[in-house]
Amino acid sequence: MTLPTQRTGVIAKKLGMTRFFDEAGQHVPVTVLSLDGCQVTGVRTVEKDGYTALQLGAGAKKAKNTSNAMRGHFAKAAVEPKRVVAEFRVEENALIEVGAELTADHFVAGQKVDIQGVTVGKGFAGAMKRWNFGGLRATHGVSVSHRSHGSTGNRQDPGRTFPGKKMAGHLGQETVTTLNVTVWKVDVERGLILVKGAVPGHEGSYVKVRDAVKKALPADAPRPGAFRKAGEAAPAAAETPAEEAPAAETEEGEG
């Protein structure tokens, strides 16, 4: 049995959510992800680095806000400074040249993907909101502590609260991976990937999208990936010519 080639993922920008209607007329909530100049900025090889991976960068960043080290790194790759940089482990036969730009047709409709992002931070939250605790009773001796989490330990032995006890604390703003998200549609001209359901992170945040590790890769998925080589211009959007209006017919007898 030959395992499928482990391809690179992409760095996408979360634009927001909308909905579409399927053939049965049911509305499908989707999240719109944009490929904001996702380019290969580095290649890791076994001979040089001990492992095989691709370093990708996405988003525009001003040169004055980029460190000298990263500015030189991007200049060596002949790409503009990137806002976000991330690595994706790939197989040796899935390496892509530096400077290539990943396109939306890297994924196909119906494919399962895993999406990793940083959840929306909600600040300090109580146990009921953070851990879905039921709280204390509304009456019968309970005063002020209706939303408290209750006991935090045992007795004199062990005489302490165990690490990891679910208590009030900071909620959100943590790295989360959503598995087996379905790709609803891809728009190559606009560089958009539409996936069913919600994606971790707020609007404008960057997420990492890769092939699902627990599902088989579709046979029509491009290998090693869909990309434009360095210096290759993006295809222009097809323009539909305007239809000419039919000329008005003049009836006989009219001047």
Swiss-Prot record:
Residues 232-248 have a biased composition (Low complexity). SUPFAM superfamilies: Translation proteins. One of its GO terms (biological process) is translation. Methylated by PrmB. InterPro entries: Ribosomal_uL3, Ribosomal_uL3_bac/org-type, Ribosomal_uL3_CS, Transl_B-barrel_sf. The modification N5-methylglutamine is found at Q156. Transmembrane segments: none annotated. Gene3D superfamilies: 3.30.160.810, Translation factors (2.40.30.10). Residues 218-255 are annotated as: Disordered. The keyword rRNA-binding applies. It comes from the Bacteria. Keywords: Methylation, Ribonucleoprotein, Ribosomal protein, RNA-binding, rRNA-binding. One of its GO terms (cellular component) is cytosolic large ribosomal subunit. GO terms for molecular function: rRNA binding; structural constituent of ribosome. One of the primary rRNA binding proteins, it binds directly near the 3'-end of the 23S rRNA, where it nucleates assembly of the 50S subunit. Belongs to the universal ribosomal protein uL3 family. Part of the 50S ribosomal subunit. Forms a cluster with proteins L14 and L19. PANTHER family: 50S RIBOSOMAL PROTEIN L3, LARGE RIBOSOMAL SUBUNIT PROTEIN UL3C. This is Large ribosomal subunit protein uL3.
